[in-house]
Amino acid sequence: MSNFLGSHAINMDAKGRLAIPTKVREELAQLCGGRIVLTANADEEKCLLLYPEPEWEVLRPKIEALPNMNKAAKRLQRLILGNAALMELDASGRILVPQTLRNHANLEKRLMLVGLGKKYELWSEESWNAYLDASAADEEMPPEMEALSL
């Protein structure tokens, strides 16, 4: 089971390659032999989702099973499945982010890799910082969170 936590500042080179941090690379090697799926996020946030292959194989059939006559479901399928790229970390622990995904998330050199338990999000550093600045002021706490003690 995945337990991805923390935020990591990383860089992407001009060819679209990025080195996965050592700790994350070790977790991915143990969990899935370094085989991952990178895809577009369906939310309004412009970031990418990085799944270890076993987690993706649990999620993929659920997305495929959505009613394709429903416009919102079809859009979700096209966005997530249509942009999914199965890849394997190279010997140096790097991945090549496809140009279409770089464009979707406005990725440039400086990036943030953010752990969310079963997956990671990959953000441009600029978008991540803007999200953090805006989120505290814009969002109300969901009722489920009111009983949570941190």
Swiss-Prot record:
GO terms for biological process: negative regulation of DNA-templated transcription initiation. InterPro entries: MraZ (IPR003444), MraZ_C (IPR035644), MraZ_dom (IPR020603), MraZ_N (IPR035642), MraZ_sf (IPR038619), SpoVT-AbrB_dom (IPR007159), SpoVT-AbrB_sf (IPR037914). GO terms for molecular function: DNA-binding transcription factor activity; transcription cis-regulatory region binding. Keywords: Cytoplasm, DNA-binding, Repeat, Transcription, Transcription regulation. The keyword DNA-binding applies. It comes from the Bacteria. Residues 7-55, 84-127 form the SpoVT-AbrB domain. It is found in: Cytoplasm, Nucleoid. GO terms for cellular component: cytoplasm; nucleoid. Belongs to the MraZ family. Forms oligomers. This is Transcriptional regulator MraZ. It comes from Marinobacter nauticus (strain ATCC 700491 / DSM 11845 / VT8) (Marinobacter aquaeolei). The gene is mraZ.
